[in-house]
């Protein structure tokens, strides 16, 4: 079995070579963001979320921490923090799983099959059990308000042009030549 750091590198490489957009924060690969599209044929179809992923030192023996950066209305996602209540990730994680499993299986399954009996968002769980039509409407409202593809994807493009200090790296003011050139 590969060492945890080698496995982390291999899993990150697989994820980056997949169809997911991955934005790394620094070179240690312990925290990064993944652009995640809502599953087809779900209430979340058409929505786009930025998912924050943190890998513990002991990854893959310990599960990654996964959270939604932009808001999502779901019984198993904390509305304020974006933390995900996902048994497979939080309790039954196995080193046999990898990051691709998180984005191709675990998160889509969570969105397709919410579990109102184990909620992080009690209001969403209650509404799902009480009035499914109202719940579905609220999910769609959140998707339209917080998960617009053009806003999330343009935020990613903006991030690419930002330097580490948060200033726009395309700013050419510092390069401007003052005065006249010698003839």
UniProtKB/Swiss-Prot annotation:
- Which SUPFAM superfamilies does this entry report, sorted A to Z? UBC-like (SSF54495)
User: Which GO BP terms sit in this record?
Assistant: protein ubiquitination; ubiquitin-dependent protein catabolic process
Where is the UBC core domain positioned along the sequence? 1-148
Q: Which InterPro entries match?
A: UBQ-conjugat_E2_core, UBQ-conjugating_AS, UBQ-conjugating_enzyme/RWD
Q: What induces it?
A: By senescence, but not by heat shock.
Q: Residue spans with biased composition (Acidic residues)?
A: 152-176
Pathway linked to the protein: Protein modification; protein ubiquitination
- What tissues is it present in? Expressed in roots, petals, sepals and silique walls.
User: EC number(s)?
Assistant: 2.3.2.23
The keyword Protein transport belongs to this UniProt entry's keyword annotation: no
- Short name of one Pfam family: UQ_con
Q: Name one GO molecular function term.
A: ATP binding
Q: Where is this region: Disordered?
A: 148-183
Annotated keywords: ATP-binding, Nucleotide-binding, Transferase, Ubl conjugation pathway
Annotated active site residues, numbered on this chain, are 85 (glycyl thioester intermediate)
Q: Which reaction does it catalyse?
A: S-ubiquitinyl-[E1 ubiquitin-activating enzyme]-L-cysteine + [E2 ubiquitin-conjugating enzyme]-L-cysteine = [E1 ubiquitin-activating enzyme]-L-cysteine + S-ubiquitinyl-[E2 ubiquitin-conjugating enzyme]-L-cysteine
Top-level taxon of the source organism: Eukaryota
- Note the SMART domains from the entry: UBCc (SM00212)
- Function of the molecule: Accepts the ubiquitin from the E1 complex and catalyzes its covalent attachment to other proteins.
- Which family does this protein fall into? Belongs to the ubiquitin-conjugating enzyme family.
Name of the protein this chain belongs to: Ubiquitin-conjugating enzyme E2 6
Species annotation = Arabidopsis thaliana (Mouse-ear cress)
């Amino acid at each position: 079995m590969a060492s945890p750091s080698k496995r982390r590198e291999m899993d990150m490489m697989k994820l980056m070579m997949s169809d997911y957009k991955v934005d790394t924060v620094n070179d240690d690969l312990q925290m990064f963001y993944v652009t995640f599209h809502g599953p087809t044929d779900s209430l979340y179809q058409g929505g786009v979320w930025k998912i924050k992923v943190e890998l513990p030192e002991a990854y893959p023996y310990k599960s990654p921490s996964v959270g939604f950066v932009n808001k999502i209305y779901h019984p198993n996602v904390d509305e304020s923090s974006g933390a995900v209540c996902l048994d497979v990730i939080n309790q039954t994680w196995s080193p046999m799983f990898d990051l691709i499993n998180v984005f191709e299986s675990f998160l889509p399954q969570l969105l397709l099959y919410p579990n109102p009996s184990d909620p992080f968002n009690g209001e969403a769980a209650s509404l799902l059990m009480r009035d499914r039509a109202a719940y579905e409407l609220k999910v769609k409202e959140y998707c339209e308000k917080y998960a617009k593809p053009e806003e999330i994807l343009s935020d990613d493009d903006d991030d690419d042009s930002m330097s580490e200090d948060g200033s726009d790296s395309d700013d050419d003011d510092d390069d401007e030549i003052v005065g006249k050139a010698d003839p």
